[in-house]
Curated annotation (Swiss-Prot):
Subcellular location: Cytoplasm; Golgi apparatus membrane; Cytoplasmic vesicle, COPI-coated vesicle membrane; Cell membrane
Topology class, membrane: Peripheral membrane protein
This protein's name: Coatomer subunit beta
Main localization of the protein described in the UniProt heading: cytoplasm
List of residues that carry N-acetylthreonine: 2
Modified-residue entries (N6-acetyllysine), positions: 494
Additional observations: Brefeldin A induces dissociation from the Golgi of the beta-COP and presumably the other coatomer subunits.
Keywords: Acetylation, Cell membrane, Cytoplasm, Cytoplasmic vesicle, ER-Golgi transport, Golgi apparatus, Membrane, Protein transport, Repeat, Transport
Length: 953
């Protein structure tokens, strides 16, 4: 018998503050009390029997005085009582009193009330005594013809259970149920009958389905789901049946029930690899995503589409459905949009890239018309990155994309503008034919850029790629326009002197006294000192940045001016024009230096920026060929090398992914003789319905699922010692959002232990769902207790507690055995993830909790230590492999991971190997961990410290 078929008893809480009733008082209430008293007494009897009391003297009393009553509440309680009361003698023979009970069952099966009949039939499903069931078989059969569907469907369940447990009692059950199914009209009755045939006589079920295969679409959804399950199981066991039933699955794709459509699509994919079948299933998935309102459903179905894409043969079919997949972008949820865009990007080809770009451009324009929202900004970023990737993969599309995206350089959202700038920088370097277009568009939006970071990037691009005399002059004009009147210091002093004009004076409104909640006076003024003055609003952008004290942009400007001046000198032969242009560039640098040294800016210029601007002045004053090469050639080559390395890294990553996806089994993989299949082939060989059932019951583990030979015994935690009167050990089963403790409790004494209770408490972000119920342990007996602990976040948690019990017949106080602590491993909740460098830096700046861990290890190789940290923390290294290759005595790497609760974890590894200590010197350094929550940062730090201790031993 499987775990799913075991009897599940209802646990009833007993108030401990009242005295347990005596058998005599209960007998008196059951014999002489009214209906209410008998009801209460029967409840107490049930609770006492559940807690281990025998009460044999009350059995005949209940049969004589309670069983004949017609009260519905008492009848329901009696069903519970007959389920739990011992029905056999110690030697296993049926009690004589149960013959009387059997007669009562028969009368209830013929009762005019359909609820009593149905409840009795449900109760009979739980009986394990064939002697009790045998006299009832005619009455159970008769219930199949009852007028009410509630009775009929429970009669089917009773017949199925009896046939499964005691086939000799009703050997013709499959034939009986088949005849019932043919004439039945009620959907729930047909569903139960069909389900029985699936498990009892699958051939008969298939024959019935063949007779009504054209009417399947008219059936109710509960019956359609069972039909899908039958077809899946039949074809899984016997592939030759596929041709017989695949048309039925196609028809069920048109069902009105989303659940049926989803299951039918999943079954169709397993039955056939034909392009038409894959296309029909994918189209069904897409329709479900669009029509379903629940975002969780959308994400689940999207995952099924992504699984389809992983198969090389299916990927080609899905490429034709890219435009249909993009319809999902109408969903406002960001996570759904993110997955959809990634899927579309993976499927895009030269055949449909043009249509994809048109749709994405429309989506980008739509984000302009939507009111500003955090998700809108993030969605715009996703669109920009997708268009960026499309343009890199399909260069012909870049010319269509650039004009639309360039407008976002002036966007208030700096993150989206930064993504556009990154795309423009890559496009202008890769595509020579687009340089003129990009420079032209850049000059158009240059004056409207609001962010200093974007302004710096735009300056660099213009300085690097303006190659004609006209473009260089246009750049100089834009810079002068953005800088305003020069010299800056003199013009600003003049403005300050004439600043307070009547129309610009700030007027102060009348002062009003207010009384606060504490009874004190508060003064309210109409003066708004934070309002920017008209003078500040009218400042040109570059001038505003400089007066705010941001002189890093000035250093970038000096480099740009130097580049275009050197290029202008090379292009123009007239000495006068050369000198004039160079002098103008030097004047701009000098006036910025003057401003930086004055008291006008909010923050003074830094020494680094002064050095950079001074260096540029010196380069322009000398104009040496060496400096010309450095500024106009080496800079561009550096960018080219960086982009090439990035592209190579992406190709390598894609190659690894494709190899991992395409190779089902390696030649040197070990064979698991238990299954005779490769480990990574097992998923497709398993019955998916059985797998989902096991997952729902919590019988599969994420780590063990990959290897069927892995044992649960590896995770057993001993809670008490072998010399303790009660021995306990637990298997910690970690699910996604909860932990199940399966505790084995063994009574090692010769006494009966009563009220043996497992008392648990938690430390950290853990919560005990329910308190385990007390139990009674016979001498040297054992029992399993399960406890559920809910997990709310990724934080090191501790479960501790004790076992308390009473010794039968002893007058002493309760005994207590203290349990060892159970430490919950956070690695079960952390998964490697990836993000861009910009996102990493942004999160690093935003996260407020930092944990600095000092490296303490015996390891002598930097790369080995990094690999050890990655394995210990389950994080992903974002630093490219090429950047970590070679040996120079020190290493810096960025790590990233996400928890299943959506928490981000960042780490920066900064390590070195002291050369002066010789080749056997241990690795030293620090690991800085940053997270949004304190628990995450501390937990990861503890994990690293623990792993370092293990390596140091």
């Amino acid at each position: 018998m499987t775990a799913a078929e075991n009897v599940c008893y209802t646990l009833i809480n007993v108030p401990m503050d009242s005295e347990p009733p005596s058998e005599i008082s209960l007998k008196n209430d059951l014999e002489k009390g009214d209906v209410k008293s008998k009801t209460e007494a029967l409840k107490k009897v049930i609770i006492m029997i559940l807690n281990g009391e025998k009460l044999p003297g009350l059995l005949m009393t209940i049969i004589r005085f309670v069983l004949p009553l017609q009260d519905h509440t008492i009848k329901k309680l009696l069903l519970v009582f007959w389920e739990i009361v011992p029905k056999t003698t110690p030697d296993g023979r049926l009690l004589h009193e149960m013959i009387l009970v059997c007669d009562a069952y028969r009368k209830d099966l013929q009762h005019p009330n359909e609820f009593i009949r149905g409840s009795t039939l449900r109760f009979l499903c739980k009986l394990k005594e064939a002697e009790l069931l045998e006299p009832l078989m005619p009455a159970i059969r008769a219930c199949l013809e009852h007028r009410h569907s509630y009775v009929r469907r429970n009669a089917v369940l009773a017949i199925y259970t009896i046939y499964r447990n005691f086939e000799h009692l009703i050997p013709d059950a499959p034939e009986l149920i088949h005849d019932f199914l043919v004439d039945e009209k009620d959907a729930s009755c047909k569903r139960n009958a069909f389900m029985m045939l699936i498990h009892a006589d699958q051939d008969r079920a298939l024959d019935y389905l063949s007779t009504c295969i054209d009417q399947v679409q008219t059936f109710g959804d509960i019956l359609q789901l069972v039909i899908v399950e039958l077809i899946y199981k039949a074809c899984h066991a016997n592939p030759s049946e596929r041709a017989r039933f695949i048309r039925c699955i196609y028809n069920l794709l048109q069902s009105s029930s989303p659940a049926v459509k989803y299951e039918a699509a999943g079954t169709l994919v397993t039955l056939s690899s034909a392009p038409t079948a894959i296309k029909a299933a994918a189209q069904c998935y897409i329709d479900l995503i669009i029509k379903e309102s629940d975002n969780n459903v959308k994400l689940i179905v999207l995952d099924r589409l992504i699984e389809l894409k992983e198969h090389p043969a299916h990927e080609r079919v899905l490429q034709d459905l890219v435009m249909d997949i993009l319809r999902v972008l109408s969903t406002p949820d960001l996570e759904v949009r993110k997955k959809t865009l990634q899927l579309a990007l993976d499927l895009v080809s030269s055949r449909n890239v043009e249509e994809l770009v048109i749709v994405l451009k429309k989506e980008v324009i739509k984000t302009n018309n939507v009111s500003e929202h955090e998700d809108t900004d993030k969605y715009r970023q996703l669109l920009v990155r997708t268009l960026h990737s499309c343009s890199v993969r399909f260069p012909d599309m870049a010319a269509n994309v650039i004009p639309v995206l360039m407008e976002f350089l002036s966007d208030n959202n700096e993150a989206a503008a930064a993504d556009v700038l990154e795309f423009v920088r890559e496009a202008i370097q890769r595509f020579d034919n687009l340089r003129m277009l990009i420079v032209e568009k850049m000059l158009e939006v240059f004056h409207a850029i609001k962010s200093v970071k974007i302004y710096r990037g735009a300056l660099w691009i213009l300085g690097e790629y303006c190659s004609t005399k006209e473009d260089i002059q246009s750049v100089m004009t834009e810079i002068r326009r953005s800088l305003g009147e020069i010299p800056i210091v003199e013009s600003e002093i003049k403005k300050e002197a004439g600043e307070l004009k009547p129309e610009e004076e700030i007027t102060v409104g009348p002062v009003q006294k207010l009384v606060t909640e504490m009874g004190t006076y508060a003064t309210q003024s109409a003066l708004s000192s934070s309002r920017p003055t008209k003078k500040e609003e009218d400042r040109p952008p570059l001038r505003g940045f400089l007066l705010d004290g941001d002189f890093f942009v000035a250093a970038s400007l000096a480099t740009t001016l130097t580049k275009i001046a050197l290029r202008y000198v090379a292009l123009v032969q007239e000495k006068k024009k050369q000198n004039s242009f160079v002098a103008e560039a030097m004047l701009l640098m000098a006036t910025i230096l003057h401003l930086g040294k004055s008291s006008l800016p909010k923050k003074p210029i830094t020494d680094d920026d002064v050095d950079r601007i001074s260096l540029c002045l010196k380069v322009l004053s000398e104009c040496s060929p060496l400096m010309n090469d450095i500024f106009n050639k080496e800079c561009r080559q550096s960018l080219s090398h960086m982009l090439s390395a990035k592209l190579e890294e992406e190709k390598l990553s894609q190659k690894k992914e494709s190899e991992k996806r395409n190779v089902t089994v390696q030649p040197d993989d070990p064979i698991s003789f238990m299954q005779l299949t490769a480990k990574n082939e097992m998923n497709c060989k398993e019955d998916q319905f059985q797998l989902s059932l096991l997952a729902a019951m919590g019988n599969t583990q994420r780590k063990e699922a990959a290897d069927p030979l892995a044992s649960k015994l590896n995770k057993v935690t001993q809670l008490t010692g072998f010399s303790d009167p009660v021995y306990a050990e637990a298997y910690v089963h970690v699910n996604q959002y909860d932990i199940v403790l399966d505790v084995l409790v063994v009574n090692q004494t010769s006494d009966t232990l009563q009220n043996c209770t497992l008392e648990l408490a938690t430390l950290g972000d853990l919560k005990l769902v329910e308190k385990p119920s007390p139990l009674t342990l016979a001498p040297h007996d054992f029992a399993n207790i399960k406890a559920n602990v809910k997990v709310a976040s990724t934080e090191n948690g501790i479960i501790f507690g004790n076992i308390v019990y009473d010794v039968s017949g002893a007058a002493s106080d309760r005994n207590c055995v203290v349990l060892s602590d159970i430490h919950i491993d956070i690695m079960d909740y952390i998964q490697p993830a990836t993000c861009t460098d910009a996102e990493f830096r942004q999160m690093w700046a935003e996260f407020e909790w930092e944990n600095k861990v000092t490296v303490n290890t015996n390891m002598i190789d930097l790369n080995d230590y990094l690999r050890h940290i990655l394995k210990s923390t389950n994080m992903k290294c974002l630093t490219p492999e090429k950047a970590l290759s070679g040996y120079c005595g020190f290493m810096a790497a960025n790590l990233y991971a996400r928890s299943i609760f959506g928490e981000d974890a960042l780490a920066n590894v900064s390590i070195e190997k002291p050369i002066h200590q010789g080749p056997d010197a241990a690795v030293t350094g620090h690991i800085r961990i940053r997270a949004k929550s304190q628990g995450m940062a501390l937990s990861l730090g503890d994990k690293i410290n623990l792993s370092q201790k293990k390596t140091s031993i």
